[in-house]
Regions:
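Contiguous, non-catalytic segments that form substrate-binding/exosite surfaces or channel walls
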Residues: 4-167
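C-terminal, non-catalytic "cap/extension" segments appended to globular domains
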Residues: 58, 87-97, 182, 190, ...
Length: 355
């Protein structure tokens, strides 16, 4: 994300040169993982490794295929965004190492935790009295470890145990991103809260397929609230860029990963070899398709598949894209339809693993 383009380029090349140096080993390791998936799927009488992976959560194959098909139809929107990025950065050629630099510098706004809490509460008023009462109870009732501290792990996390309220770990640092993280993690926490309130222990967990919906829906509602109430032009540009990057990174990028997994597993199931040359070629073709003509697809990016750890947990990443899509759709439904949509959403939060 460095504003210095030469630093971005050098970091990009240095990173992928390390993976390229180990390409034979990593390709053999990934190929073994894919072949293992294919073997166990065949041994257990599944039609494919993808069918076996999705069966754990009773997800139809059509969900996976429809995601890829629908996102592929929407690729012109990503191409427009890439072209906009090229224009805004003012470069003759946009490269892969230009994708992560912010189009708008981080908004120089300090948001203390108390202000972040108030803003999140205000944004989520649309969720109705029951949800907001639980939200306030969690925020004020000792659920959250707010600030960075010596020996404390980084990042953010929501965790809990049935029969006890959820706990939320934050490392709030007064940034806009920290405020979104608060909304996100409280979405997870309240998902658990409403499930535990209604379901017995047997059904008190959530599948990954739905877990990110509750957290991302809160983020989407916060974003809509901020865009509606913010008057400062620079701040609005920052928020819009933040939102667009979520679509690029969560919907489009994760679907590209999902498509890569689908193809590599199909190759293995047909007895085709999985070599670094073949996977580099495939990954390059996907990047060319997804990002369009406005960007130079650098040779170094061909090996990016080698650094994605999720690929060793086959057919996992698609859930980021479906979860994000569902969250955006639900947030719009809540904003447009009001109480009936809120009631249906709270019912969803209360289901756990019961259905």
């Amino acid at each position: 994300e460095s504003p210095d383009r030469s630093i971005r380029e050098q970091a990009f090349k240095n990173l992928y040169s390390v993976y390229s140096a180990q390409k034979n080993t990593i390709a053999a390791t990934y190929a073994a993982s894919v072949k293992s998936d294919a073997f166990f799927a065949q041994a257990r009488k599944y039609g494919s490794a993808m069918e076996m992976a999705l069966s754990d959560d009773n997800i139809p194959l059509s969900v996976y295929d429809t995601l890829i098909e629908t996102v592929n139809k929407s690729l012109p929107l990503l191409h427009r965004y890439v072209a906009l990025r090229k224009k805004e950065l003012g470069v003759d050629e946009l490269h892969m190492y230009d994708l992560y630099v912010p189009l708008v510098p981080d908004a120089d706004v300090k948001i203390p935790y108390e202000q972040a809490k108030a803003t999140v509460k205000e944004a989520l008023q649309v969720m109705g009295e029951e949800y907001c009462k639980a939200l306030s109870h969690g925020m004020e009732g000792g659920w959250i470890d707010v600030y960075e501290n010596k020996g404390k792990r980084g990042g953010a996390y929501s965790w809990g145990s049935y029969g006890v309220h959820p706990f939320v770990l934050l490392n709030h640092n007064d940034t806009i991103n920290s405020m979104f993280t608060l909304a996100h993690e409280m979405g997870h926490a309240l998902h658990s809260f409403f499930t535990w309130k209604k379901q017995p222990y047997l059904y008190a967990d959530h599948k990954i397929f739905v877990a990110e919906v509750a957290s991302t829906c809160n983020e989407a509602l916060l974003m809509e609230h901020l865009l509606k109430t913010t008057k400062d032009k620079t701040m609005r540009k920052y928020l819009i860029n933040y939102f667009l990057e979520q679509f690029r990174g969560t919907l489009f990028r994760q679907t590209m990963f999902a498509e890569f997994e689908k193809i590599t597993h199909a190759m293995a199931e047909k007895g085709e070899p999985l070599t670094w040359e073949g996977m580099n070629k495939l990954y390059r073709e996907l990047n060319l398709k997804y990002f369009g003509d406005a960007i130079v697809v650098d040779d170094e990016i061909d090996i990016e598949w080698a650094r994605i750890p999720h690929f060793y947990n086959a057919f996992y990443v698609y859930q980021y894209a479906t979860g994000y899509s569902a969250a955006i759709a639900l947030s719009r439904k809540i904003l447009n339809e009001g109480q009936p949509a809120v009631a249906a959403y709270l019912d969803f939060l209360s289901k756990g693993d019961s259905e």
